[in-house]
UniProtKB/Swiss-Prot annotation:
It is an enzyme of class 6 (ligase). It comes from Triticum aestivum (Wheat). Residues 1-42 are annotated as: Disordered. Sequence repeats lie at residues 56-194, 453-605. Keywords: ATP-binding, Ligase, Nucleotide-binding, Repeat, Ubl conjugation pathway. It catalyses: ATP + ubiquitin + [E1 ubiquitin-activating enzyme]-L-cysteine = AMP + diphosphate + S-ubiquitinyl-[E1 ubiquitin-activating enzyme]-L-cysteine. ATP binds at residues 472, 498, 509, 522, 570-571. Pfam families: E1_4HB, E1_FCCH, E1_UFD, ThiF, UBA_E1_SCCH. GO terms for molecular function: ATP binding; ubiquitin activating enzyme activity. InterPro entries: E1_4HB (IPR032420), E1_FCCH (IPR032418), E1_FCCH_sf (IPR042302), ThiF/MoeB/HesA (IPR045886), ThiF_NAD_FAD-bd (IPR000594), Ub-activating_enz_E1_C (IPR018965), Ub-E1_IAD_1 (IPR042449), UBA_E1_C_sf (IPR038252). This is Ubiquitin-activating enzyme E1 2.
Length: 1051
């Protein structure tokens, strides 16, 4: 059984609810004002690091100065406001003139039953403020006037009549400067967005991608000129792109910085719309870089756009005719609400018919745009569920609209132009719903019941769900599941596991966490917060990593009891493992992921779709070791090398020293046994650390850092260029220093150079830490004292050496080369090490430093950025600031709240289908979306690959079972009856039987499980009744046949 955490969580929930009601832990308005006043344009890089990786400082600063209005605080408005507060705008003003109803609890996670009867906006203010004290959150109640809008940079309306929207949009469109106007609605399983950012809106960066670059190999003197690039990496240029050139030798006319147009772009070449016939002949070198000019977009005001909408932004091309119909449907609903002052009643035939009639009458006025056919069944679904704001739809559209507000305030990314319509009518149950099943039950789920019926609601509440991960995706999922009522009955259960703890950088997206949760387990805190949203949620919070090592926790009984699995993971290895378990136990897996403004979802449904592991992205291309260590040509190479050197000097070598000191005999014996270049290098580093480079004072650390600077950035470069002078030729007669290689030059040290001095001080501080030496305060910032300390270091003159071997083979995997006398050298080093160790004080040990990217006070990134930038200076590569260095060296995954919210909303729309059952593969949807462009690509999942043999067929989802505790011979005969000749049977990594081995025939009459216990040393857990074996088979024509896993049941 799983460890129960219910009692702990429930107690924590009660405390948190008391705090919330008492207002504890929440910012007062005065505190909010103070936070705002103190913030200015300062960006908390620890908090916003993942967001900065998406937007950059140039976007965050105008965003931090923006005031936004969100009108309509049902679920959609709450989601938009949440995303904006997390993004860090200057202020968010909430407007709603309605009061909280029980109905609202289906989609607004800020509200509870205690808020019923209060104004919606006022009920949300304090909880929204708690998400980010640097954002000023306030409420505006009562009637909204045009004059109210003038103080905002962007206004969002989620529940407004069309006439009023047109009035407000006209004001915003003609205002100077224009106010960005967004109208968005979620009506049941249907949603819409309209954007108007004014007569002319300038987009500063249309896609957020880094400008593409190429390394030039040749340029023709022609019209147009043919530009060829090195074949290290494919070019990403497209026809019509603008590019600039730099560092071109010979044809220097191209270095003028003038943007030139690309045409006929190919993987490694393109033509340039330029006559270079009179230019100088190309000699060598050259970098070509994409130029991304600003784009001006002219928006139509809403009134004009309603009658002339232009092209709709598509999402699902199987519904190509759907957007014009939904454009009509939303107008018909608006007319119904205007005339009757209410929404249609769910299941009411009369109300549905009236909406359809309105749609037909509006359609008759459209002239050339009149629709030939109107799908009345679709309009029935639309009208019947239109009052409901469903949580998954609110989450999805909250992400989309939140991102559009960021675009409006910053000019970053291409705006949505201008209408977007979406529906997920496939989420409805397969069987028709009766009107009685849609009636409200005075429940917090009434809105959801009005769309899906009470039968599905009961299934949701009794669901047994396993959610893996409780970070950014996990927080969104927990909020969604709690609002949907998933696992909220006595029979339901939601298990969430995550072995990670909360860090400050999580807080800008993982909104269930607060400052005071830093250091606590993510799963426990998230589960506690989810139970505040819905106290009836039955949740178990675990801190176990789901992996082969924890199959005693997540055992067969656990998996067999599940209804679905939701992944909220951030790495492929874990995803692959969970996918394999879902295939094995035949459980639906709902998969999703984000990368900056991009997100994707994948549905893995037993027997209907392919599994996650069936298709994988190609692995990222790794730079050759010789490129990173001797021939870098971009900053990524420099940073890869910098992190490697950091770990070698400050973590691996001190760890090696401690390994030797803890057990010298064992360590020396292992070095002798290995007897290779790696063992030799390790011994040399340990001796250096304990002898020549041993530090006893902080000045020793300064000396070490200064000499390392000279070694890395001067001596090694001098040796490299001595071995390979600038005019060197390869064995084939080509210049050695040709693209992509860049000829390096040594860096001359100067203590008056702040970047050089800062690097040496940071390196000295970390070196002192490894030796446990107290750090002088004056060393923490560059100053005169620090410069004097560095300048007093005596630096020996460098003398180049003959015969030094430098690895140039791109296929080499090691920089160390074996030598015939390695064993003799190792013996000398061991003798030296034993001698050195006698001089060490008793109890001496070192303190290895493990790289931590998210602490700006620990000097780790100062060292890595310094390493990389000095290296870049050697090779004339553009340098980067510490923040950019952190993104690359720290391998930070760019992340923002908006794409995360959208992904989880889409997944939860699929969860309705998975839990309802009975849906066909064509009802499910996989999605790839990029909110930056914006692009929405929605398609049916791919069915699993089917293998056929004679009259049999199977897929990855099938598992063959054999009962009766059979022998190996009986298993072979069982397969023979299927027309399959088995020649090999294995269990895990052990071979139980192979027809080629005569001795294996002695095993044929033994039980399969007994052979596995003996050969594979396998003990089958007491809770498991079967053993899995992999069988290799051939047909009668000796063709291999891949068969499913075979489970032999023996008890």
């Amino acid at each position: 059984m799983l460890p129960r955490k219910r009692e702990i969580v429930a107690g924590e929930v009660e405390d948190l609810q008391k705090k919330t009601r008492a207002g504890e832990g929440e910012a007062t308005r005065e505190e909010g004002d103070a936070a705002m006043a103190g913030r200015g344009n300062e960006i908390d890089e620890d908090l916003h690091s993942r967001q900065l990786a998406v937007y950059g400082r140039e976007t965050m600063k105008p965003l931090f100065g923006s005031n936004v209005l969100v009108s309509g605080l049902q679920g959609l408005g709450a989601e938009i406001a949440k995303n904006l507060v997390l993004a860090g705008v200057k202020s968010v003003t909430l407007h709603d003139d309605g009061n909280v109803e029980l109905w609202d609890l289906s989609s607004n996670f800020f509200l509870s039953e205690n808020d019923v009867g209060q104004n919606r906006a006022q009920a949300c203010v304090q909880k929204l403020q708690e998400l980010n004290n640097a954002v000023l959150v306030s409420a505006l109640t009562g009637d909204l006037t045009k004059e109210h809008l003038s103080k905002f940079q962007a206004v969002v309306f989620t529940d407004i009549s069309l006439d009023k929207a047109i009035e407000f949009d006209d004001y915003c469109h003609s205002h100077q400067p224009p106010i960005a106007f967004i109208k968005s609605e979620v009506r049941g399983l249907f949603g819409s967005v309209f954007c108007d950012f004014g007569p002319e809106f300038t987009v500063l960066d249309v896609d957020g991608e880094e400008p593409h670059t190429g390394i030039v190999a040749s340029i023709s003197n022609d019209n147009p000129a043919l530009v060829s690039c090195v074949d290290d990496e494919r070019l990403e240029f497209q026809d019509g792109d603008l590019v600039v050139f730099s560092e071109v030798h010979g044809m220097t006319e191209l270095n003028d910085g003038k943007p030139r147009k690309v045409k006929n772009a190919r993987p490694y070449s393109f033509f340039l719309e330029e006559d270079t016939s009179s230019f100088g002949a190309y000699v060598r070198g050259g970098i070509v870089t994409q130029v991304k000019p600003p784009k001006v977009i002219k928006f139509k005001p809403l009134k004009e756009a309603m009658s002339e909408p232009g092209e709709f932004l598509m999402s699902d091309f199987s519904k190509f005719e759907r957007p014009p119909l939904l454009h009509l449907a939303f107008q018909a609903l608006d007319k119904f609400r205007t005339e009757l002052s209410r929404f249609p009643v769910a299941g009411s035939t009369d109300d549905v018919q009236r909406v359809i009639e309105y749609a037909i009458s509006i359609n008759d006025t459209l002239g050339d745009r009149k629709l030939e056919e109107i799908d009345k069944k679709l309009l029935h679904h639309f009208a019947s569920g239109s009052r409901a704001v469903l949580n998954p739809m609110a989450a999805m559209f909250g992400g989309i609209v939140g991102q559009e507000v960021v675009k409006a305030c910053s000019g970053k990314f291409h705006p949505l132009y201008q209408f977007f319509y979406f529906d997920s009518v496939e989420s409805l149950p397969v069987d028709p719903l009766e009107p009685g099943d849609l009636k409200p039950k005075n429940s917090r789920y009434d809105a959801q019941i009005s769309v899906f019926g009470s039968t599905l609601q009961n299934k949701l509440e009794e669901a047994k769900i396993f959610m893996v991960g409780s970070g950014a995706l996990g927080c969104e999922f927990l909020k969604n599941l709690a609002l949907m009522g998933i696992s909220c009955s006595q029979n339901g259960n939601l298990t969430v596991t995550d072995d990670d703890v909360i860090e400050k950088s999580n807080l800008s997206r993982q909104f269930l966490f607060r400052d005071w949760n830093i250091g606590q387990p993510k799963s426990t805190v998230a589960a506690t917060a989810a139970m505040v949203i819905n106290p009836k949620l039955h949740v178990e919070a675990l801190q176990n990593r789901a992996s082969p090592e924890t199959e005693n926790v997540f055992n067969d009984a656990f998996w067999e009891n599940l209804d679905a699995v939701v992944n909220a993971l951030d790495n492929v290895t874990a995803r692959m493992y969970i996918d394999s378990r879902c295939v094995y136990f035949q459980k639906p897996l709902l998969e999703s992921g984000t990368l900056g403004a991009k997100c994707n979802t994948q549905m893995v449904i037993p027997h209907l779709t392919e599994n996650y592991g069936a298709s994988r992205d190609p692995p990222e291309k790794q730079a050759p070791m010789c490129t990173v260590h001797s021939f870098p040509h971009n900053i990524d190479h420099c940073l890869t090398w910098a992190r490697s050197e950091f770990e070698g000097l400050l973590e691996k070598t001190p760890t090696e020293v401690n390994a030797f000191l803890s057990n010298p005999t064992t360590y020396i014996s292992a070095a002798r046994t290995a007897g290779d270049a790696q063992a030799r290098d390790q011994l040399e580093r340990v001796i250096e650390c304990l002898d020549r480079d041993k530090c006893e004072t902080f000045q020793d650390s300064i000396t070490w850092a200064r000499l390392k600077f000279e070694d890395y950035f001067s001596n090694r470069v001098k040796q490299l260029t001595f071995t390979f002078p600038e005019d060197s030729m390869t064995s084939s007669g080509a210049p050695f220093w040709s693209a992509p290689k860049r000829f390096p030059r040594p860096v001359e040290f100067s203590s008056s150079d702040p970047s050089q001095l800062s690097f040496i001080l940071a390196a000295a501080i970390l070196r002192a830490e490894t030796f446990g030496i107290p750090i002088s305060e004056w060393a923490k910032t560059p100053n005169k004292l620090a410069a004097e300390a560095v300048d007093k270091v005596i630096v020996p003159d460098f003398q180049p050496k003959q015969g030094v071997k430098i690895v140039t083979d791109e296929k080499a995997t090691s920089l160390s080369s074996a030598s015939v006398d390695d064993a003799a050298v190792i013996e000398e080093l061991i003798a030296k090490l034993e001698e050195v160790s006698k001089t060490l004080p008793s109890g001496f040990h070192m303190n290895p430093i493990q790289f931590e990217k998210d602490d700006d006070t620990n000097f780790h990134m100062d060292v890595i950025a310094g390493f990389a930038n000095m290296r870049a200076r050697n090779y004339s590569i553009p340098e980067v600031d510490k923040l950019k260095a952190k993104f690359i060296a720290g391998r930070i995954i760019p992340a923002i709240a908006t794409s995360t919210a959208m992904a989880t909303g889409l997944v939860c729309l699929e969860l309705y289908k998975a839990l309802a059952g009975g849906h066909k593969v064509e009802d499910y949807r996989n999605t790839f979306a990029n909110l930056a462009i914006p692009l929405f690509s929605i398609a049916e999942p791919v069915p699993p690959k089917t293998i056929k043999h004679q009259e049999l067929s199977w897929t990855v989802w099938d598992r063959w079972t054999v009962t009766g505790n059979i022998t190996l011979r009986e298993l072979l005969e069982w397969l023979k009856e299927k027309g399959l000749n088995a020649y090999s049977i294995s269990c895990g990594t052990s071979l139980l039987y192979n027809s080629m081995f005569p001795r294996h025939k002695e095993r044929l009459d033994r039980k399969v499980v007994d052979v596995a216990r003996e050969v594979a040393k396998m003990e089958v857990p007491s809770y498991r009744r079967h053993l899995d074996v992999v069988v290799a088979c051939e047909d009668d024509d000796d063709n291999d046949v891949d068969i499913p896993l075979v489970s032999v049941y023996f008890r």
